[in-house]
Amino acid sequence: MPNGNATIESRRFGVEIEVEGISTERARRELRLPAGWKVTSDGSLYDGSEIVSPPLTLGDFGQVEQVLSLLKRHGARVSERCSVHVHVDGNGFDLEGIKRLVQNTRAYEPWVYQIARGADAEHRGRNGNHYRYCKPIEEVHRNGETDYDGLMKARSFKRFWERWYGVPRQELPRIFSSKYHPCRYRGLNLHSFNYRGTVEFRYFDGTLNPADIRAWVTLCLRLVLKSLNEARVLRGIKPMETRRNPLYRLAQGLGLTAEERRMFQHHKLVWK
């Protein structure tokens, strides 16, 4: 049953910001981060670190701006190895809501990859790694990692997760208790839902631009709220539509406010 009480102002989210040019050790030593923020290591980065936020709401976004300013002052930079991950609180999701989230994300995923680029940049997935760390739902279905049609037919969470992970149900408790599983390297990471209670969106490129991150967080929140609050799912787009201006349809489909719509226009994200 849809959860009509979820709002964009109250829904909690978190961000993970990957950067290079400042090592984990130096970041821990020199950065005066807001309370609850932490620095972690990431082996995929060159002389880099990952900055992880505590749970936030949109009213706390000034903390993100503060952290990005700190990083720039200390010489941080981003490369094709860097990304931004957005976690959204998974509270309130039942089986049908999770199905709708998968359907809605898949429907707009070609546009999500366009939006996921930093301003005037190529998405890191185009740099020879074929979205290695943020696989599209369509690719995961096509290569047999997950039976998408079977997911939509599942009548219980156990059956849904069997098909999401591609394992028998007796293996699920072991998988749920582990932070790491290969399926976390998908653009929509639902392993995070089982491990820490969040839905993770891994599509986004590295950036030190707060406006990029604000737009991406808004997109993720709107996808989650659409899936929680409305039984009707988004209609999939045809390949040719990814080359047209989709902003009107995106705004209508996700319920973007006029201010949110301007947010995407202002940063020259690729709509055509």
Each language-model region and where it sits:
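C-terminal accessory/tail domains of diverse enzymes
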Residues: M1-V78, N91-K272
